Amino acid sequence: MQLTNFTDFGLRALIYLASLPKGELTSITVVTETFDVSRNHMVKIINKLGQEGFIKTVRGKNGGICLGRPADQIIIGEVIRSIEPFNIVNCAPEFCHITPACRLKTALAKAKQAFLDELDQHTIQDMLTENNELLILLKRV
């Protein structure tokens, strides 16, 4: 199963924010430069993550972004459910004439659920715990 770039970069942004010292704000520009992604794309991602409560935005001269809740309370499966469209196949009868008898949609739904069930066992904090290699890459050690 492949996640959209939107979700991929959203998870990366959360991991980056979790690597910051508690209470430290950063800018969207810093996040975009860290992952070499378009600023416009990252603004949309940060806005969505903010709407979902995963990121807190602070306006003003000394503003920035940070996690909206502790990293050990941000469940990866929950993040993905919030921002990933999950249109695995188009099963509308006007697009596929075998829809009434097809069992593929059910099998794919079960696979998606197993995928999310596994990701529900992991938090953003889990991605950083005892992971000095990642912290070095994020320049946090």
UniProtKB/Swiss-Prot annotation:
| A GO cellular-component term linked to this record | cytosol
Question: What are its cofactors?
Answer: [2Fe-2S] cluster
- Which InterPro entries does this one have? Tscrpt_reg_Rrf2 (IPR000944), Tscrpt_rep_HTH_NsrR (IPR023761), WH-like_DNA-bd_sf (IPR036388), WH_DNA-bd_sf (IPR036390)
> What are the HTH rrf2-type domain coordinates in residue numbering?
2-129
Q: Which Gene3D superfamilies match?
A: Winged helix-like DNA-binding domain superfamily/Winged helix DNA-binding domain
Molecular function terms from GO: 2 iron, 2 sulfur cluster binding; DNA-binding transcription factor activity; double-stranded DNA binding; iron ion binding
Q: What does this protein do?
A: Nitric oxide-sensitive repressor of genes involved in protecting the cell against nitrosative stress. May require iron for activity.
Phylogenetic classification of the source organism:
Bacteria, Pseudomonadati, Pseudomonadota, Gammaproteobacteria, Vibrionales
Species whose genome carries this gene: Aliivibrio salmonicida (strain LFI1238)
Entry-linked SUPFAM superfamilies: Winged helix' DNA-binding domain
Kindly list the biological process annotations in GO that this record carries.
Answer: negative regulation of DNA-templated transcription
Gene encoding it?
A: nsrR
What keywords would UniProt list here? Answer: 2Fe-2S, DNA-binding, Iron, Iron-sulfur, Metal-binding, Repressor, Transcription, Transcription regulation
Q: How is the cofactor bound?
A: Binds 1 [2Fe-2S] cluster per subunit.
The signal peptide stretch is none
Identify the residues that bind [2Fe-2S] cluster: 91, 96, 102
Give the DNA-binding residue ranges. 28-51
Protein name per its UniProtKB record: HTH-type transcriptional repressor NsrR
